[in-house]
């Protein structure tokens, strides 16, 4: 074989060698393939050449296919020098500790498979492998690549195992070194372990914590008890006193509804708590009153600076923060004003301070402003609502108040103020003109007993209503719950005996918005103008009520359950006196009359006897159209809200329906009595005004009263005070509008319930007996009074 023509093929980068490579012989087939430039060997010139190096400038880089490399693996042996260099590279890259578990060298693995070992490679080669030329292997060196791969896999596995052993040895060494020092020292515990709830509170912190708890529980009901605990909480130093006053002040300003209670507390504490010497030599002693007034003054004077700081928050990301701070400042300002007013009532604040505050809020003086700030306007309204009556009681203060209200009247027409504030100022001006009597009751904290007393006055509730009987009638029947309480129909409210909402009990009132029941026991929605009660009531048929022969006299439908009311009312309205097709056992047990136990009662005549007065009222009234009724209710609601007589007169004249004036009178009485006793006076003034203006005739007033009396038996179930209030209205109309006293007898005849009759008659006699003109009327109508007394028996 001719060596001059053998191509040199190398696996090193660049694809070339430095000349002929002895010992690198190929098989004839592979040599033939390497001699040409066919598909198996494609030359790429220029990409791998290095300028200046003759070995890389003219040589070709040869690429092999996968099949050729597989053939090379079978015939090529890796030289020992390459294996040695590979080991040195691993040492430099990974360190000796990563490969210390390997065999001495991969050369040993190689030499174990060779027939003639080379001892000169057993030593570590420290020469520079980059500068030396690779020595060609011996001709007889043959090694399979599979053996090399298996050897490398075994080497990696042994390296991982040795690494784990090495890590375990290091841990053992650490524990052994610690064991030589001695036993582990015991855990050192702190003398006072930290705890979120444990700690040694100082005397001041303990007192403040106690005071906070007392203030959180303070109510008008427990006022005296908790006030004593507060006095005994341990307020023994001036610092504790100041902090306690700060706590009370903060609670008061953020709870304005309870300001009267906190003002009373401050007054009592000012009398009971001791004073303390001043911290500064020659200073005034520290008292509860002085510290409290200083807090009020600082809060009042510091509000302006707080608003200035809030005004600086103009960034878009500060909008929420600005609103929150404005709300807090407003609450503190109004609460502070309310507290100062309540302290004035307790004689803890002199009037000169109050006048100074009013002048500051209104902007009086040399620097008088054309329009005060909105916060100041709201504060001054709050101030006069609280203490206006007290200031007017003093003649000197009243003259000063006159100047204040002149300026406030100017604010009612100042367009620079928001409409809400203008109306607020106007309400205060009207309040003073009305002798400081508010249109609606002020919301204030009440005790449980006060709430019960108010319920008795407003709803007519009486103690022990469940155990009492009225006019010899039994307690209401009906199904009982497992606890023994009456079962309720939907919308009847509570279920406890004697409470509002229990069927048939005094003060029984439906829940707002709940449906009513018609005479067939069907639930129907209630409208605002619908008469109150458990069933639908049509005005026409109800006015033509049959006489007592159609209805057993011993039964009071008000005391029957809701389901049984229809059994009686249905036959009465239809004009048939016979019992229903399925007699109720409940009705039989309540009546005990032979008329219901008889198998075939006699039918009543087609023309039952009717009270003549009721016929007269029915003949003179007509059913009001729905549109007119809606307008009537609307204008009456508006009048009871603003109470302007001329405007109400104009609205009634615009209806142009004189034939329905009696219905309007009835609606006015119904609406006023439904609202409560405070609306009796506006109702009477309205009817007197319309009668004086010749809009309502005396006959309209009489018919309207009779129409309402026909509904009173059902209305009285929901409004126990309705009979007494209605009697007062009738008496006042008799005194002022010329309503004849005989109408009282007619009204009593229209009401079948003796209890309601008595309520009406007693109210009439009481109202007219307290007036000289009324006494004259009573003396001239002794016959009518006797007839009324007979109706009460």
From Swiss-Prot:
It comes from the Eukaryota. GO terms for molecular function: mRNA binding; translation initiation factor activity. Keywords: Initiation factor, Protein biosynthesis, Translation regulation. Residues 107-117, 587-597 have a biased composition (Polar residues). Pfam families: MA3, MIF4G. Residues 544-557 have a biased composition (Low complexity). Residues 120-129 have a biased composition (Basic and acidic residues). Residues 208-435 form the MIF4G domain. Gene3D superfamilies: 1.25.40.180. GO terms for biological process: regulation of translation; translational initiation. GO terms for cellular component: eukaryotic translation initiation factor 4F complex. Residues 1-23, 105-129, 462-606 are annotated as: Disordered. The keyword Iron does not apply. Disruption phenotype: Displays resistance to rice yellow mottle virus (RYMV) infection. InterPro entries: ARM-type_fold, Initiation_fac_eIF4g_MI, MIF4G-like_typ-3. Residues 627-749 form the MI domain. Plays a role in the accumulation of a sobemovirus (RYMV) during viral infection. Belongs to the eukaryotic initiation factor 4G family. EIF4F is a multi-subunit complex, the composition of which varies with external and internal environmental conditions. It is composed of at least EIF4A, EIF4E and EIF4G. In higher plants two isoforms of EIF4F have been identified, named isoform EIF4F and isoform EIF(iso)4F. Isoform EIF4F has subunits p220 and p26, whereas isoform EIF(iso)4F has subunits p82 and p28. This is Eukaryotic translation initiation factor isoform 4G-1. It comes from Oryza sativa subsp. japonica (Rice).
């Amino acid at each position: 074989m001719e060596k001059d023509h053998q191509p040199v093929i190398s696996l090193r980068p660049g694809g070339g060698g430095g000349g002929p490579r002895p010992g690198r012989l190929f098989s004839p087939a592979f040599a033939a393939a390497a001699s040409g430039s066919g598909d198996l060997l494609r030359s790429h010139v220029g990409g791998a050449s290095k300028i200046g190096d003759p070995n890389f400038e003219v040589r070709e880089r040869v690429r092999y296919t996968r099949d050729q490399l597989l053939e090379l693996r079978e015939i090529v042996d890796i030289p020992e020098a390459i294996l040695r260099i590979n080991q040195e590279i691993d040492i430099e890259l990974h360190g000796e500790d990563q490969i210390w578990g390997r065999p001495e060298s991969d050369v040993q693995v190689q030499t174990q498979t060779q027939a003639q070992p080379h001892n000169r490679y057993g030593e570590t080669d420290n020469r520079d492998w980059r500068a030396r030329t690779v020595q060609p292997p011996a001709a007889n060196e043959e090694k399979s690549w599979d053996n090399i791969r298996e050897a490398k896999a075994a080497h990696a596995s042994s390296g991982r195992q040795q690494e784990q052993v090495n890590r375990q040895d290091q841990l053992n060494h650490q524990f052994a070194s610690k064991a030589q020092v001695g036993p582990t020292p015991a855990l050192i515990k702190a003398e006072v372990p930290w705890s979120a709830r444990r700690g040694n509170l100082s005397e001041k912190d303990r007192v403040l914590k106690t005071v906070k708890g007392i203030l959180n529980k303070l109510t008008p009901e427990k006022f005296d008890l908790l006030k004593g605990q507060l006095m005994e909480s341990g307020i023994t130093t001036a610092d504790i006193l100041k902090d306690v006053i700060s706590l009370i002040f903060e609670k008061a300003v953020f709870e304005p509804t309870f300001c009267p209670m906190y003002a009373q507390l401050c007054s009592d504490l000012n009398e009971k708590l001791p004073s303390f010497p001043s911290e500064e030599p020659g200073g005034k002693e520290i008292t509860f009153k002085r510290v409290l007034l200083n807090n009020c003054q600082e809060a009042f004077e510091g509000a302006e600076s707080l608003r200035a700081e809030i005004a600086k928050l103009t960034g878009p990301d500060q909008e929420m923060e600005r609103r929150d701070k404005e709300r807090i400042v407003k609450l503190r300002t109004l609460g502070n004003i309310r507290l100062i007013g309540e302290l004035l009532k307790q004689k803890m604040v002199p009037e000169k301070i109050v006048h100074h505050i009013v002048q500051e809020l209104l902007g009086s003086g040399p620097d008088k402003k054309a329009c005060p700030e909105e916060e100041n306007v709201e504060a001054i309204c709050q101030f006069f609502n609280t203490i206006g009556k007290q200031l007017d009681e003093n003649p000197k203060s009243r003259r000063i108040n006159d100047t204040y209200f002149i300026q406030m009247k100017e604010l009612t027409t100042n367009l620079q103020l928001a409409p809400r504030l203008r109306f607020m100022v106007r309400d205060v001006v009207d309040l003073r003109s009305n002798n400081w009597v508010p249109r609606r009751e002020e919301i204030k904290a009440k005790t449980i007993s006060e709430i019960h007393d108010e319920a008795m006055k407003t709803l007519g509730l009486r103690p022990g209503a469940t155990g009492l009987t009225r006019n010899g009638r039994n307690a209401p029947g009906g199904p009982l719950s497992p606890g023994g309480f009456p079962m309720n129909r939907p919308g009847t409210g509570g279920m406890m005996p004697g409470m509002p909402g229990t069927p048939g009990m005094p003060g029984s009132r439906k829940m707002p918005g709940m449906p009513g029941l018609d005479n067939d026991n069907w639930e129907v929605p209630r409208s605002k103008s619908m008469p109150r009660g458990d069933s639908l009531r049509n005005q026409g048929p109800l006015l033509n009520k049959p006489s007592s022969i159609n209805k057993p006299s011993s039964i009071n439908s008000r005391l029957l359950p809701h389901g049984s009311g229809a059994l009686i009312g249905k036959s009465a309205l239809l004009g048939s006196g016979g019992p229903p097709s399925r007699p109720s056992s409940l009705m039989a047990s309540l009546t005990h009359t032979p008329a219901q136990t008889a198998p075939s009662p006699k039918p009543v005549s087609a023309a039952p006897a009717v009270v003549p007065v009721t016929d007269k009222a029915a003949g003179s009234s007509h059913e009001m159209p729905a549109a007119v009724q809606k307008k009537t209710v609307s204008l009456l609601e508006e009048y009871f809200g603003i109470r302007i007589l001329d405007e109400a007169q104009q609205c009634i004249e615009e209806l142009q329906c004189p034939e329905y004036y009696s219905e309007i009178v009835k609606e006015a009485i119904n609406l006023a009595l439904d609202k409560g006793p405070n609306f009796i006076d506006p109702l009477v003034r309205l009817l007197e005004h319309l009668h004086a203006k010749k809009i309502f005739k005396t006959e309209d007033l009489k018919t309207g009263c009779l129409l309402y009396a026909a509904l009173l038996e059902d209305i009285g179930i929901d409004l126990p005070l309705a009979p007494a209030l209605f009697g007062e209205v009738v008496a006042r109309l008799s005194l002022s509008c010329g309503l004849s006293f005989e109408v009282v007898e007619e009204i009593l005849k229209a009401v079948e319930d003796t209890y309601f009759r008595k309520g009406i008659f007693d109210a009439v006699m009481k109202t007219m007996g307290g007036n000289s003109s009324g006494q004259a009327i009573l003396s001239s109508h002794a016959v009518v009074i006797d007839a009324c007394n007979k109706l009460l028996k």
